[in-house]
UniProtKB/Swiss-Prot annotation:
Coiled coil: none annotated. Its main location: other. It holds the Pfam family OST-HTH. Disulfide bonds: none annotated. This is Maternal effect protein oskar. Capu, spir, and stau are required for the initial localization of osk to the posterior pole. One of its GO terms (biological process) is visual behavior. Organizes the germ plasm and directs localization of the posterior determinant nanos. Oskar protein is required to keep nanos (nos) RNA and staufen protein at the posterior pole. It comes from Drosophila melanogaster. Keywords: Developmental protein, Endosome, Phosphoprotein.
Length: 606
């Protein structure tokens, strides 16, 4: 049980002693006068002759007929005299009562603000103590009511304290505690009623009432969490809707999530101070001047951010890369970026989805009108008679590649297929996002589910098997395979996942394809789920043991530190919804993608 101490007055509010004594005296006098009146009336009726002649059943008629007028006059005189004497006092009582009521309401408003902060947890019986000097009340909360909840959820106290510790600057409301608990554990909060009483039974938990009337919970410092509490309190202050400060932007309703196929025109221009009003349009006459003019590092970074809305969390890599690219890149006309708002908008006549021309069987065409149907990234330049298709060039250079344009004989013959150098990629949203952001591979048009080659959003192992049957690849093609995360997130049994993976490898061998396997990376938004993390560990162990005759790239180790803890600085800030699965994905940021690419490229060889 927990005792809540407040400062309500111990005795009931009463009027002054003079008013109370006067009221008691008037009541006694009225009672005495009425009693005397009835006694005189009874004596008078007994002395009359009509009372002796009548029976007892006619007492009411005799009483009313004989002396109604006299009795009414007596009552009228009694109440009239009492009204005259009490009238001056009745005018004073409501005024005094109003003053006391206003004083009481002001005291209650002050007490409510400190009601929850003065809470003390105890295991005693339910008691009520009052003291006229201190004016304190103790009400209790029965702690034994929540024993069953703690037996079913043994870690709920520590989890709630962790949530309160992370919001120690401004406190947190009950609704926010429930949402944070669901994000932390994946389960709904076990209580729906009396949540305040339950939270106050947790040691070192305090509560107070804000100006808006919301109950704000916080955590007191102790020997165990004192250093952590100081660290949180010394962080950069952030206000929230449930604190006394200004409202925060984190609780303002956001726009629905944008899928990758939607915002091809990136909105990085506003952050890079490159507004369409201030940037002049690029014309064909100026392309030669732009190609020969020395380009600054900041301008090159802005151009990269326009075509690739990357996260600016690895500026060191961007700095080194563009310095190297500016030295090694040949002098050639700069292509117009079709994603830039400055590019001229031309009508593009696309074929229907069912009659899309096949890039594998159709020969290259030099006419600009025919190239529009093939999704070409560049426009024809002055003095160039040969239009280079995108698949004739190596992808955007990563860590170990240069910035020059080289022809590749083994590159997949498609504008949309995801590949790294000459190696096709097969995987789910992690590989799809990696190919889009780092390798500049495009998505296949007119598809509801985002896909690029063998990379499909929400791709499972069985889905990869079915997709592999519809793809024609030359024998001996080495395919980088990263698959299995979706099956694990959907709760599929591990033995079934391993069986499907064996069938996938077997079918690739039957098609004379060479798989280059990668183990699964840690799932940043499921690190709290020990069962799922253990399943990932066992599946990676299975890949290493069963596929010992194949090349296996360990990308899991580059996303954890030496103690086995996940490097959350390699992940984005929050999960994102994808088109092919209902499970949210916490993608790698720029640092994480570059780490994975570096590990993969280091292990590749022809």
């Amino acid at each position: 049980m927990a005792a809540v101490t407040s400062e309500f007055p111990s005795k009931p509010i009463s009027y002054t002693s003079t008013n109370t004594s006067a009221k008691t005296y008037y009541l006694k006098s009225v009672k005495k006068r009425v009693t005397t009146c009835f006694q005189q009336l009874r004596d008078k009726l007994q002395s009359s002759g009509s009372f002796r002649k009548s029976s007892s059943s006619c007492l009411n008629q005799i009483f009313v007929r004989s002396d109604f007028s006299a009795c009414g006059e007596r009552f009228r005189k009694i109440f009239k005299s009492a009204r005259k004497t009490e009238l001056p006092e009745l005018w004073k009582v409501p005024l005094v009562a109003h003053e006391l009521t206003s004083r009481q309401s002001s005291q209650q408003l002050q007490v409510v603000a400190r009601l929850f902060s003065s809470t003390q947890i105890s295991t005693k019986e339910i008691t009520y103590n009052s003291n006229s000097n201190t004016s304190e009340n103790n009400m209790t909360i029965i702690e034994s009511n929540y024993i069953s909840v703690r037996e079913e959820y043994p870690d709920i106290d520590s989890e709630v304290r962790a949530i309160l510790l992370s919001h120690a600057q401004n406190g947190i409301t009950i609704s926010s505690i429930k949402s944070e608990y669901r994000k932390l554990t994946g389960n709904p909060f076990p209580l729906h009623d009396n949540v305040t009483d339950f939270l106050l039974t947790i040691p070192n938990v305090t509560a107070e009432c804000s100006e808006s009337g919301k109950r704000i919970f916080n955590l007191k410092a102790s020997l165990k969490n004192g250093h952590l509490l100081d660290m949180v309190l010394n962080q950069k202050e952030r206000t929230s809707d449930y604190s006394s400060g200004a409202p925060s932007l984190e609780n303002i309703p956001r726009a629905p999530p944008r899928y990758w196929k939607n915002p091809f025109k990136r909105r990085a221009l506003s952050q890079l101070n490159t507004s369409p009003r201030t940037v002049p349009k690029i014309t064909d006459e100026k392309t030669k001047d732009i190609a020969t003019r020395p380009v600054s590092l900041h301008q090159m970074a802005n151009e990269a951010a326009e075509s690739n809305w990357c996260y600016q969390d690895n500026w060191k890599h961007l700095n080194n890369f563009y310095q190297q690219a500016s030295v090694n890149a040949p002098k050639m006309p700069v292509p117009i970026n079709i994603y830039s708002p400055d590019a001229p908008e031309e009508p593009i006549n696309l074929a229907p989805p069912g009659h899309q021309p096949s890039c594998r069987t159709q020969s290259q065409k030099t006419e600009p009108t025919e190239n529009r149907h093939l999704g070409i990234f560049v426009h024809p330049f002055n003095g160039m008679n040969i239009m280079k298709r995108r698949h004739e060039m190596t992808p955007t250079p990563t860590i170990l590649t240069s910035g020059t344009y080289n022809d590749s004989l083994l590159t997949i013959n498609s504008d949309y297929d995801a590949y790294l150098l000459d190696f096709p990629l097969m995987g789910d949203d992690f590989m799809l996002y990696l190919a889009r952001m780092e390798l500049k591979c495009r998505f296949r048009r007119h598809e509801r589910v985002l896909q690029s080659g063998l990379c499909v959003s929400g791709l499972t192992i069985n889905g990869a098997r079915n997709r592999l049957k519809r793809v024609q690849l030359p024998e001996g093609t080495q395919i980088i395979v990263n698959i299995g995360s979706v099956d694990i997130m959907r709760g599929k049994p591990l033995v079934q996942i391993e069986h499907d993976f064996r069938l996938l490898i077997k079918e690739m061998h039957n098609m004379r394809l060479v798989p280059i396997l990668t183990n699964l990376a840690p799932l940043g938004n499921y690190c709290h789920d020990k069962v799922l993390c253990d399943k990932i560990y066992r599946f990676n162990k299975f890949i290493r043991s069963e596929c010992c005759h194949l090349k296996v790239i360990d990308i899991h180790s580059c996303l954890i530190n030496e103690r086995g803890v996940v490097r959350f600085d390699c992940f984005q800030a929050s999960p994102r919804q994808v088109t092919g699965s209902k499970e949210p994905y916490l993608f790698w940021n720029k640092i994480g993608r570059q780490r994975v690419l570096q590990v993969i490229e280091t292990s590749l060889e022809y």
